[in-house]
């Protein structure tokens, strides 16, 4: 099981929480590109802009059972478990309520504000990229996920 950190909003950060909660409520996490690329299973990692190469990992490295710390405005928002494979649609459908073309089905394990109810006590998890694999078990986000899973009895 791999731990991930992810933001769920397009470039419009003024609606980050709205996009995040809507995506989670629908049971999906996803991402997209400013310069559209197609299905990531058909794309070589080196063909993706350097600033977005981590997106390739979403299709090729993320597995069912992996855990995602969803972040909004540099604070933990939710913890989710990946329950489905990588999917791609050519164009997002507004009726579906998602803005992204690259997505995975998830199960929300919990919301951070339900565990730490006083915002002044929230742990800041500065995040400037859209998605990243958490490789350092001593890192703040990795430790937060481990503690959260322990509270959930997982």
Can you say where each PLM-predicted feature lies in the sequence?
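Short, surface-exposed loop and linker segments with low hydrophobicity and enrichment for Pro/Ser/Thr
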Residues: 1, 60-63, 97-98
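Compositionally biased, charged N-terminal/linker segments
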Residues: 1-59, 149-154
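Beta-strand-rich binding-surface signature
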Residues: 3, 67, 103
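Short, flexible beta-strand-to-coil junctions
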Residues: 9-11, 71-75
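Short coil-to-beta transition motif at edge beta-strands of beta-rich domains
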Residues: 57-70
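C-terminal accessory regions
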Residues: 64, 73, 77-78
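Aromatic- and Lys/Arg-enriched surface recognition patch
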Residues: 75, 81-139
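Low-complexity intrinsically disordered segments
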Residues: 137-153
């Amino acid at each position: 099981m791999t731990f991930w950190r992810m933001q769920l909003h397009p470039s419009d950060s003024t609606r980050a929480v709205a996009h995040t909660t809507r995506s989670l409520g629908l049971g999906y996490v996803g991402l997209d590109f400013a310069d559209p690329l197609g299905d990531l299973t058909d794309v070589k990692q080196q063909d993706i802009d350097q600033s977005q190469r981590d997106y390739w990992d979403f299709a090729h490295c993320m597995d069912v059972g992996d855990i995602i710390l969803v972040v909004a405005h540099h604070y933990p928002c939710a913890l989710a478990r990946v329950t489905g494979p990588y999917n791609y649609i050519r164009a997002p459908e507004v009726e579906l309520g998602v803005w992204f073309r690259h997505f995975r089905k998830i199960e929300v394990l919990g919301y951070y504000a339900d565990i730490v109810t006083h915002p002044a006590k929230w742990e800041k998890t500065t995040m400037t990229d859209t998605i990243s694999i958490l490789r350092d078990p001593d890192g703040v986000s990795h430790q937060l996920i481990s503690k959260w899973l322990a509270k959930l009895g997982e």
